[in-house]
Amino acid sequence: MKTIEGNLQLKGNEKIAIIASRFNHLITDRLVEGAKDAFLRNGGKEENIELILVPGAFELPFGLKRAIKTGKYDGIVCVGAVIRGATPHFDYVAAEATKGIANTTLQADIPVTFGLLTTDTIEQAIERAGTKAGNKGFEAMLGLIEMINLYKEL
């Protein structure tokens, strides 16, 4: 049986976008830095990264759709943080952002990865943005690198 899988080594010419929500920027800034770090550590070049900022998580799918349409990128990472509050707003934003990103990704002809945190507390978000639980932006970029390379093999 032949196995086809991606690897974590970039050639250096791959162009990527990081689409980040500005809302909860203390968290999302760390996710962006984690994604950038993973890209650079695995052979990417800083000049091949574009950061696209959208107001909040709900706007991530639209930003993703427009970025895909440009045809400029080999892959895209979406990052953001939705933190539960006292109202049902969290449930709507988290569900619709997730669904929008998933639906847009399935229509894309480039790899897209998901680094949107949906947490119950600010502490959980902080943990997932570079402290106890690693950095989910870094992890999302590793997934993107692997998928970019897998895409080339398929």
UniProtKB/Swiss-Prot annotation:
HAMAP family: Lumazine_synth (MF_00178)
Organism for this UniProt entry: Nautilia profundicola (strain ATCC BAA-1463 / DSM 18972 / AmH)
Keyword Transferase: yes
Protein's recorded name: 6,7-dimethyl-8-ribityllumazine synthase
SS bond partners: none
Keyword Transferase included in the entry's annotation: yes
Reactions it catalyzes: (2S)-2-hydroxy-3-oxobutyl phosphate + 5-amino-6-(D-ribitylamino)uracil = 6,7-dimethyl-8-(1-D-ribityl)lumazine + phosphate + 2 H2O + H(+)
Keywords: Riboflavin biosynthesis, Transferase
Residues binding (2S)-2-hydroxy-3-oxobutyl phosphate, per UniProt: 86-87, 128
Alphabetical list of CDD domains matching this protein: Lumazine_synthase-I
NCBIfam families reported for this sequence: lumazine-synth, PRK00061.1-4
